[in-house]
Amino acid sequence: MDSWSKNFELLIKSRTPLIWIRTKEEERLYKVIYQSCKKLNIRRLVSWDCVNGIKGVLNENGKFSNNPLGVLNWIKEQRSELPTILLVRDFHKFYDDPSISRTLKELSSLLRETKNNLILSSHILPSSEELDDLITIINLPLPDVSELTALIKKIAFNTCLLYTSPSPRD
């Protein structure tokens, strides 16, 4: 995973504006991006999905639920010096909408001039060839041995706690 994280961080540092990450592991992806944000001193990681809207920005939480165009326009308006990564989940459902395609084209050039990145996440690759040259597509690899070992240790530890803690009757 270290090599993947380094490559991802290089994409962020080089101001790659649009990155599509193919994965079914949304929470794991968020954690990996969060760790990269800490390393790169990016203080604002914002996520969006069509049910919950924006998460991670004070006074913005819940905005743009079921409005993918609204959230794309939101990142377009973020001009502050505070670097922002916007993680948009399940975007494949909206990708073929002409207004979404147009906005992604605009964001491709606009985000290069800011310290912001748009990360699109889905287990399905984009279907339109129209935007192929504008979006960098990468796959989140399966967990490596060290990640799996850490997960097994965590499960074992929690299981031990569960079975060794005193029962409420004691």
Question: Which residues make up each language-model segment?
Answer:
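Sensor-1/coupling segment of RecA-like P-loop NTPase cores
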Residues: 107-129
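Extended, compositionally biased accessory segments flanking or bridging domains
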Residues: 1-81
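Conserved AAA+ ATPase "SRH/arginine-finger" region at the nucleotide-binding site
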Residues: 137-148
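Short acidic, S/G/P-rich loop/turn micro-motifs used as interaction or catalytic elements
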Residues: 26-28, 53-55, 91-98, 125-127
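Conserved P-loop NTPase "ATPase switch" module shared by AAA+ and STAND
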Residues: 70-100
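Conserved AAA+ ATPase "sensor/coupling" helix adjacent to the nucleotide-binding pocket
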Residues: 150-161
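Conserved small/polar residues in nucleotide/adenosyl-binding loops
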Residues: 163-170
